[in-house]
Amino acid sequence: MDKQLPVSVWPEWKITEKIGEGSFGKVYKACRSEQGTTFYSAIKVITIPSNPGELSSVRSESPNEQSVKEYFQGLVDECIQEVSTMEYFRGNSHVVSVEDYKVVEYLDDIGWDIYIRMEYLTSFMEYCAGRALSEDDVIRLGIDLCKALEYCQCQNIIHRDIKPENIFVSRFGEFKLGDFGIARELERTMSGLSKKGTYSYMAPEMYKGEAYDSRVDIYSLGIVLYKLRNHNRLPFISLEKQLITYRDKENALNKRMAGEKLPRPAEAGDA
């Protein structure tokens, strides 16, 4: 454990362990006790700027400290906007629920920590470790996430990054969709990337920089389901080879983006 919550954030919550880490933040398991009962949450901590080098880089290209602060304040505002978007989903049984968030500005330098408290869930990757998903499991996953995407569409929200890493499982076995672009939006802004999402599951129109709509999420979910019924291999990746090279992945991606017909998944059931 390498983080403690500032007293001003949620004094009743105590961090117990780190459970995840990405380019722009870390995720911790936290608990609180009340009348003999222990409750758990996941707390994501996003740090802006993410490291001293990032701050130095912006300083070297800015005329003064005020410009530097305004730049990073803009990133904080974007992040808060993304978190606020999650308010639309509170109570939805197929979307990760955000319970609260706090923004803490540094006193000694330019910087912020954004604390986002969410329901504590099992990551899909952890859920799948050591177990083989049956066809019924995959169908249930598809149904649960389609319900999440249906609600997204009603709110005019496009997720744009459907992938196994953004899927979670409740203790009741419900599959839930998470990460509605907080870290992704920061990554796009900081690195100048024009394409959002992950290439492995990305719809061709997004990859090519063309106009797209909510159907890109359905496409990406389809690729996730395809992989789960294809011995964990993406379309056009050989099922015979044990060692998959970077070139193999690039060739498979190029075929998919060119619109070639996808082979039937190895474990596809009868339609």
PLM segments and residue spans:
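Short beta-strand micro-motifs within the conserved protein kinase catalytic domain, predominantly
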Residues: 97-111
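Conserved short submotifs of the Hanks-type protein kinase catalytic core
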Residues: 109-124
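Activation segment signature within eukaryotic-like protein kinase domains
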Residues: 141-142
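Catalytic-loop of the protein kinase fold
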Residues: 153-169
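Conserved activation segment of eukaryotic-like protein kinases, specifically the C-terminal portion
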Residues: 192-206
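Conserved catalytic-loop aspartate of Hanks-type protein kinases
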Residues: 217
